[in-house]
From Swiss-Prot:
GO CC terms: cytosolic large ribosomal subunit
NCBIfam families registered for this protein in UniProt: rplS_bact
Entry's Gene Ontology molecular function annotations: structural constituent of ribosome
Gene Ontology biological-process entries: translation
Keyword set, alphabetical order: Ribonucleoprotein, Ribosomal protein
InterPro entries from the UniProt entry: Ribosomal_bL19, Ribosomal_bL19_CS, Ribosomal_bL19_sf, Translation_prot_SH3-like_sf
Record protein name field: Large ribosomal subunit protein bL19
PANTHER family: LARGE RIBOSOMAL SUBUNIT PROTEIN BL19M, RIBOSOMAL PROTEIN L19
Pfam (any one): Ribosomal_L19
Family stated for the protein in its record: Belongs to the bacterial ribosomal protein bL19 family.
Organism: Shouchella clausii (strain KSM-K16) (Alkalihalobacillus clausii)
Keyword Ribosomal protein: yes
Name of the gene this protein is made from: rplS
Amino acid sequence: MSNLITEITSEQLRTDHPDFRPGDTLSIHVKVVEGTRERIQVFEGVVIKRRGSGISETFTARKISYGVGVERTFPLHSPKIDKIEVKRYGKVRRAKLYYLRSLRGKKARIKEIRR
């Protein structure tokens, strides 16, 4: 039974996404439907967590919009995601960056590394 599930889901896995980790700053291009029109909306933020594996893998990105923190969770293999671009690679020592929620201003910065 599990072989059947992995066989079906392996066809739907996307391989066109770049390699990214928590702490990296991403630009996620999402297809948004408004009425009858479909457009691309860009969400740029820091990855604070990745969870799951296979077809059910998700990641959460956080950004500050007009002084308010906004977090959005995306399914990694969703057809609604047009493309993902890595803007900065961050150096962090945790897999889940929930502590960024309580930090403001310069304390919320993440050290950048060159890859």
